Swiss-Prot record:
Motif (D/ECD-tripeptide): 465-467
Residues annotated to bind Ca(2+) 2: V403, N406, L408, E410, E413, D416
Binding residues annotated for Ca(2+) 3, in chain numbering: D467, P468, E470, D482, V483
Coiled-coil region(s): none
Protein name from the UniProt record: Zinc metalloproteinase-disintegrin-like
Known cofactor(s): Zn(2+)
The EC number(s) this enzyme carries: 3.4.24.-
GO biological process, one term: proteolysis
Tissue specificity: Expressed by the venom gland.
Organism: Crotalus durissus durissus (Central American rattlesnake)
Residues annotated as signal peptide: 1-20
Localization per Swiss-Prot or TrEMBL: Secreted
Known glycosylation sites: N371
Reported function: This protein is a zinc metalloprotease from snake venom that possesses hemorrhagic activity.
Length: 609
């Protein structure tokens, strides 16, 4: 049981009201100044943590007392959360900061069922809360030896540009399916019963323009990214989706792609970079690029219905506003497209509020998805089955004490289907998080009607010759761990060697780049990799293209022979300014008998792994 802590904010009886002030959010025309005083009610002798698990604030807004309940967002970071930036000479620097005792909270207002809150308590209180249908922002004032905070409505922040800001996605409901009436747009109890929370493992990427905009202050950028992720996590909880930040990458020395105002170009380049670079070194489900470049006529763009795709599970967001809430809503919107959600039409509603999936950003940013969005999202999940977001964090990976009713299976729990009011799992006792009498299991790929699946039932299909299928044991609800054949084991009749569950060979890589009737080129074509220029090199060091040694030429740029109709190109290669890595021979590819490519070298398979 989490000890609930009581914190009071003491204000003057008549809080100061100002007419205009410049804050981080911009020029604010009407605001209140409050002076928080923190009083913590802890048991005698208890050690106070730096950031409590739960807090309660009492404050006055517009002269009326309100009570703000806050709980630490313990699903914000994954246990393997990492941060990457680059030294001035281009060296990749990756760290794994401790994130257990962070300072990011979600909450609500007492006696206001529609209220929400997303607050950072790192240095004072900063964030937003919705009260009686209106959005308020709070932030500490930068005054020496003062705990003064400003509270103000979003509508009182001066907007630099009142022109509508659009999402770049042009698909609409007409490109999807016949429109269903709003009353039909529901997810059935059966869907929820067998499909509880999904888990999106998110990586945020910050471009060089944002680094420059923030005067190379990486700590400031990190704090902003944490606050954005906290709000996105809050928004998606109501869609039964947990968004966990698993990584942050800051292009501190230079952009890793060419970031252009043309949003389609930049999104394509970012997707290719994610596929060929980021995914090879960081496991995640979705990546979003934040840029300070002014995108042409749009503030965001994403692929639709693309979650889990190596290239297209991506979006780009312009750092359009200093207000974190605004940018977080744009991010939630673009990620919504990745989850199969289209722009709202006139049939769609989210009560009295504007909805997140409007084609243009609303005058007041909304934190609510419409009924159409809810249906769209779960229709995509149920029918397209994006498998990467199904994996639930292991109980030992969750950085928090176990809490029955949060829909996360934690240490000491046999099941967790949410609160008794919301539980749709016939196998689980929601009050105790224990299995009901006669039940062997309550979830898992090897659980059918509360019983373990029969031994030998396939629970994970083979993806290649190097990735055998997994089968249920008959003794557990969980599918056995995904295992691959040993790296270096011959595959495809000795045309290749296994590498991380795949059998990479040049023929398949040529096919992926150019289509049918394209094959591995003759050896003479690969000799061009000794040039050390854009169409021939083995690897890059400090931004320089390193020519291949004669014995390594088949581990540089890929050359293919095009025999397709109307083509006669014996040395065809692929090169793109937006992604120089695309078109290179993949790691683990056979480069000679008994040898594979590793970091631009052709090395003995016996010593490569």
């Amino acid at each position: 049981m989490i000890q609930v802590l009581l914190v009071t904010i003491c204000l003057a009886a008549l809080p100061y009201q100002g007419s205009s002030i410049i804050l981080e959010s911009g020029n604010v025309n009407d605001y209140e100044i409050v002076y928080p005083r923190k009083v913590t009610a802890l048991p005698k002798g208890a050690v106070q943590p730096k950031y409590e698990d739960a807090m309660q604030y009492e404050l006055k807004v517009n002269g009326e007392p309100v009570v703000l309940y806050l709980e630490k967002n313990k699903q914000l970071f994954s246990k393997d959360y990492s941060e990457t930036h680059y030294s001035p000479d281009g060296r990749e620097i990756t760290t794994y900061p401790l994130v257990e005792d962070h300072c990011y909270y979600h909450g609500r207002i007492e006696n206001d069922a529609d209220s929400t809150a997303s607050i950072s308590a790192c240095n004072g209180l900063k964030g937003h809360f919705k009260l009686q249908g209106e959005m308020y922002l709070i932030e500490p004032l930068k005054l020496s030896n003062s705990e003064a905070h400003a509270v103000y409505k979003y509508e009182n922040v001066e907007k630099e540009d009142e022109a509508p800001k659009m999402c770049g996605v042009t698909q609409n409901w007409k490109s999807y399916e016949p429109i269903k009436k709003a009353s039909q747009l529901v997810v059935t109890a059966e869907h929820q019963k067998y499909n509880p929370f999904r888990f999106v493992e998110l990586v945020l990427v910050v471009d060089k323009a944002m680094v420059t905009k923030n005067n190379d202050d990486l700590d400031k950028i990190k704090t902003r990214m944490y606050e954005l992720a906290n709000t996105v996590n809050e928004i998606y909880r109501y869609m039964y989706i947990h968004v966990a930040l698993v990584g942050l990458e800051i292009w501190s020395n230079e952009d890793k792609i060419t970031v252009k105002p043309e949003a389609g170009y930049t999104l394509n380049a970012f997707g290719e970079w994610r596929k060929t670079d980021l995914l090879t070194r960081k496991k995640h489900d979705n990546a979003q690029l934040l840029t300070a470049i002014d995108l042409d006529r749009v503030i965001g763009l994403a692929y639709v219905g693309s979650m889990c795709h190596p290239k297209r599970s991506t979006g780009i967001i312009q750092d359009y506003s200093p207000i974190n809430l605004v940018v977080a809503v744009i991010m939630a919107h673009e990620m919504g497209h990745n989850l199969g959600i289209h722009h709202d039409s006139g049939y769609c509603s989210c009560g009295d509020y504007a909805c997140i999936m409007r084609p243009e950003i609303s005058p007041e940013p909304s934190t609510f998805f419409s009924n159409c969005s809810y249906f769209d999202c779960w229709d995509f999940i149920m029918n397209q089955n994006p498998e990467c977001i199904v994996n639930e964090p292991l109980g030992t990976d969750i950085i928090s004490p176990p809490v029955c009713g949060n829909e996360l299976l934690e240490v000491g729990e046999e099941c967790d289907c949410g609160t008794p009011e919301n539980c749709q799992n016939e196998c689980c006792d929601a009050a105790t998080c224990k299995l009901k009498s006669g039940s062997q299991c309550g979830h898992g790929d090897c659980c059918e009607q509360c019983k373990f699946s029969k031994s030998g039932t396939e629970c994970r299909a083979s993806m290649s010759e190097c990735d055998p299928a997994e089968h249920c044991t008959g003794q557990s609800s969980e599918c056995p761990a995904d295992v691959f054949h040993k790296n270096g084991q011959p595959c495809l009749d000795n045309y290749g060697y296994c590498y991380n569950g795949n059998c990479p060979i040049m023929y398949h890589q040529c096919y992926d780049l150019f289509g049918a009737d394209v094959y591995e080129a003759e050896d003479s074509c690969f000799e061009r990799n000794q040039k050390g220029n854009y169409y021939g090199y083995c690897r890059k060091e400090n931004g320089n293209k390193i020519p291949c040694a004669p014995e390594d030429v088949k581990c540089g740029r890929l050359y293919c022979k095009d025999n397709s109709p109307g083509q006669n190109n014996p040395c065809k290669m692929f090169y793109s300014n937006e992604d120089e890595h695309k078109g290179m021979v993949l790691p683990g590819t056979k480069c000679a008998d008994g040898k594979v490519c590793s970091n631009g070298h052709c090395v003995d398979v016996a010593t490569a792994y």
